[in-house]
Amino acid sequence: MGSEMCIRDSATSESLMNDRLGGTTSSLDGGNIRYYGASPKNYVYFNCETYPSTNCELWRIIGVFDGKIKLIRNGSIGSYSWDTSVARINSGFGIAEWSQADIMKVLNPNYDSDSVGGSLYYNSKSGNCYNGQNNATISCDFTSTGIKNEITKKMIANFTWNFGMYSDSSDLYSNQIYVKERGTNVFANPSDGITRTSTWNGKIALPHPSDYGYATDFLKCTDNIFDVDETDKTFYNCGANDWMLRVGGTTDYWLLVPNNYHESGVNLAYVSGYLINATKASYAYGIIPTLYLEDQILHSGDGSQSNPYQLKA
């Protein structure tokens, strides 16, 4: 999970770093600002019944990107398919294309007419969601975990999400993954006939693999982002010092970016502390909503779990 980025670009007292856009800029102010380490003070109240602090959920700040605060929910909303399909399409394992993914339609607005999953999380409703091969479904209830009100919905930015693919993941570090995610490489000529894209404009998605990689402490972790050598002491240092490992609790959770190995392959964060590629999209794993805020201000709190930052709505 390590990075070739210089450690001098970090503020260790605050567990903040400048990622220098994966090393593509030398500007001191040109990169994204990220929280890293085992337990940074990056907790924030969000999805509140009344702002700034009444009946809120705990979320965590990944960092600041293009001037917008990027948040991830501090916990899964349940385990569901990233996508699934009928048996004749990719053997029922789904299509790794976020712009039409089943879970994307659960998380975002304007899919109310879909009989399964359609905007249920965004509208705090219950119904059925996909959770297995061959369009298998399960009941799902977001009445207490979904987006609570119009005030919160207006705080969520429409943002251009990047998910360029990569096939040489075993040799890549966090900064290299970040650059590839912002690239245009996609799965070429898929047998399912669905054109793949490398960007999507919308409100709610899933964390990037690079987010997970950059969340560790590079002074203690030098492995690459997909290292699976569990006999290596450094491997344990990576997971032990990565706050994003804990947002899923004991649940493996889905990431945003597909991979280049097969038509149904998507990246997964594994609770042992590393990432797995080529996981079938139809499998049911944790879903952790991730989003960007409009121009919100953190106006109180210190970011600790007991005194989270509060947003001025």
Segments and roles (model prediction):
Residues 3, 8-313:
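Long, domain-scale functional regions
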